[in-house]
Every structure is written in structure tokens, then in C-alpha cells.
Amino acid sequence: MIDGDGFRPNVGIVICNSHGQVFWAKRYGQHSWQFPQGGIDDGETPEQAMYRELYEEVGLTKNDVRILASSRHWLRYKLPKRLVRWDSKPVCIGQKQKWFLLRLECDESKVNMQRDRSPEFDGWRWVSYWYPVRQVVSFKRDVYRRALKEFAVIAMPFKERKFKRKGKKG
């Protein structure tokens, strides 16, 4: 399902723990890391898609997490031209994402990335809240920054909320 502007509806998932750290997952067979995410199927709400993706990619259920927030708006990123499949109809030029902030409510030992026949991830770790903004693939960086900025007031202790971009003074 691709919208009229060429963007595929998708959900992004930020899972936090009680220390303000976030769940950071290693892409299967690669050296890149990202938050769990996935497409919204026809007839599915963003929340339903989030729970489905959470189970498929991380092995957690609705009972293992609590929704703390969802993004107010769809956040978009364009794919680099080299990743666009120009021969597909309609052409998908990027993703528009509804983001969810979840708190892990169960023991982290319940994380199971091998539930699906084609796992998305083969490793994970807890990282500091702003770490993903500088580590994710460059074309997703602005969306990550915007989602984390929106969720910071909920996810982080007050003194750690501010994110400073490199090269800016103040």
C-alpha cells in the first residue's frame, strides 16, 4: 500500500526501559542498527500494525509493553535513489511513519528475535536515548531526531532531554 505521494505507511517503535535507555536492534546479517519498524497492512490501524511488528520482529506481545505515546503526525523520509525500485507500480519513494513510544513491562529475557522465519534482527542492546540519532543510516536520521525529540519529555529524566546538534553553539 503506497499513498498518492509515493510513501509507504509504516510504524516505528521506540522501546524504553526504566533507565531512559532505548532498545537498539542489529539488522540480520548486517552491520547496521535501527529501531523496529514495519509496514501497515490494508485494513490495519497503526496501533495494530505496531503490535504485529513488535511480535514479528522482537517477540513481544501487547502484555509485555505499555504505550506511553504516539507521534502526533506522520514523519516521512525519502529513500536514496539507489534504493528506489523504479520498476514497481506504484513506485515507493520513501516511508511515512507513525511512531510509538513503549515502555518494556516484562523481563528483557522475553525478547525473541527468532520467532519469524525471516528475522529482521539478530542482536540487540540498550543504548542511551540520543545514541540512535547519530548511528542510524543517514536518510533516517531526521525522522529519528524528530520522533525522539517529541517523546523526550515522557521517556527521559528532565536534565537529559536536550539534544544538541554537532556544530551548533549554545
UniProtKB/Swiss-Prot annotation:
Xref: PROSITE patterns: NUDIX (PS51462), NUDIX_BOX (PS00893)
Enzyme class: hydrolase
Family membership: Belongs to the Nudix hydrolase family. RppH subfamily.
A molecular-function term among this protein's GO annotations: mRNA 5'-diphosphatase activity
GO biological process per UniProt: mRNA catabolic process
EC number: 3.6.1.-
The name this protein goes by in its record: RNA pyrophosphohydrolase
PANTHER family in UniProt: M7GPPPN-MRNA HYDROLASE
Motif (Nudix box): 38-59
Protein keywords: Hydrolase
GO CC annotation, single: cytoplasm
Domain Nudix hydrolase: residue ranges: 6-149
Role summary: Accelerates the degradation of transcripts by removing pyrophosphate from the 5'-end of triphosphorylated RNA, leading to a more labile monophosphorylated state that can stimulate subsequent ribonuclease cleavage.
InterPro entries: Nudix_hydrolase, NUDIX_hydrolase-like_dom_sf, NUDIX_hydrolase_CS, NUDIX_hydrolase_dom, RppH
SUPFAM superfamilies: Nudix
Cofactors (names): a divalent metal cation
One Pfam family in the UniProt entry: NUDIX
Hydrolase as UniProt keyword: yes
